[in-house]
Amino acid sequence: MSQDLQKEVASRKTFAIISHPDAGKTTITEQLLLFGGVIRSAGTVKGKKSGKFATSDWMEIEKQRGISVTSSVMQFDYNGSRINILDTPGHSDFSEDTYRTLMAVDSAVMVIDAAKGIEAQTLKLFKVCRMRGIPIFTFINKMDRQGKMPLELLAELEEVLGIESYPMNWPIGMGKELAGLYDRYHRVIEQYRSEEDERFLPLGEDGDLKEAHAIQKSLYYDQALEEIMLLDEAGNDFSRERIIAGEQTPVFFGSALTNFGVETFLRTFVDFAPSPSSHESNEGVIEADNPKFSGFIFKIQANMNPAHRDRIAFIRICSGEFERGMNVTLTRTGKSMKLANSTQFMADDRETVNRAVAGDIIGLYDTGNYQIGDTITNGSKKLEFEKLPQFTPELFMRVYAKNVMKQKHFHKGVEQLVQEGAIQLFKTWRTEEYIIGAVGQLQFEVFEHRMRGEYNSEIRMEPIGKKIARWVKEEDADEKLSTARSMLVKDRFDQPLFLFENEFAINWFNDKNPDIELTSLL
């Protein structure tokens, strides 16, 4: 790989933003895009009446409900780095899509609501990041409102998440009393409300301001200095190595809504966040600077533009250089393909991509060739990256088309939404009626909404009273083993499994059939 290309790859910073719903994830995403010069003003998800919707929320149901249910991909340049942001679903039901997204990034930014602290969804996503060993940067948001005390938030972060923390800055007051941020890294105080030339006040060797200033009269100024002294003496030592290893999280305080502390966070993040690294494959570790092009499909999205009825496969480039029109191999099928139609996104705005390098995320127009987890490369025709995990659904519904004359629309919609991973599909053993499985209730709502809006198919869904899926070997697939509490079905790959009513039904099945092995996904 040439030095120029190595430099280009090193400039990539690809990360996901994770949080609990309503922690301010979409707002901070928009402020980052503002600093990247991509948008002129940040729209707010909550201001529905203004008609301004969040840049990253493009699907109709997201605009209506103010939640992210798909993962958007956004790119911009900042201070010599090419930033790729993946805005993950902020709703607890969408763990599958989020998990796949986290497989495609090199670091994560965790947004926490200062009033609520660590919430269930944040903890779940954090564990996935820890499992992958990627660096986690923490932004404690909503400091313009009254919330938990900063020291309490730090203690919660360390106790609940089990990770070292190092505050990069420290709030001087909060809510109506918020006066500024004491920036330990850049050795300045950033004022909350000030003229531009007075926004950053330099600190002296003693840790106090070099020159006297009105901010020192703030009720919380002396308290902040005392807390900083405590952190210096009793807190964790700053360690770039531990940050990169995912063992220490740098913590930033701020307010995304008032755009306070966000640019300082971005500037520091760009300094610390890792560039694209290696990926495990069946042929060993593939380094980002490997000259051969390779990547994997982590997401498929149909109807991003309803007018065009298109379908996009999102690929994370793992190594080498992509050039539009290049020939590659889809290793699952061994099929040779020409990548002529490639695109990059800013929510629902798109532009053609002529070249991209390791770390970049691009969209490929898909006519049905790709599946989630596919590897494509112009190197070894047998190369395959690690499989993306699939979750075991916990809710199941039988699904029918209301209008039997529109079966074609119905089947096309189900097939496409299953292929993009929006829902999982099962079929009854003999009659092959459709049963759909989801991790959470909202997935069914999104499925119904998209079937109606994108495929013109009104559907009816009925609960089947089963909650647990367990796969069996083909030789053990006997319909006579089905009971009122268990049901033999097949998945989209025709693999047999039983759907059980509850744990009691599984235990009963195991007692009656000790030789049959039941297996689960994640």
Curated annotation (Swiss-Prot):
GO CC term (a single one): cytosol
Function as written in the Swiss-Prot or TrEMBL entry? Increases the formation of ribosomal termination complexes and stimulates activities of RF-1 and RF-2. It binds guanine nucleotides and has strong preference for UGA stop codons. It may interact directly with the ribosome. The stimulation of RF-1 and RF-2 is significantly reduced by GTP and GDP, but not by GMP.
- Name of the protein in question: Peptide chain release factor 3
Gene Ontology MF annotations: GTP binding; GTPase activity; translation release factor activity, codon nonspecific; translation release factor activity, codon specific
What PROSITE patterns is this protein classified in?
Answer: G_TR_1, G_TR_2
What range(s) does the tr-type G domain occupy?
10-277
Q: Which domain of life is it from?
A: Bacteria
Q: Which organism is it from?
A: Listeria monocytogenes serotype 4a (strain HCC23)
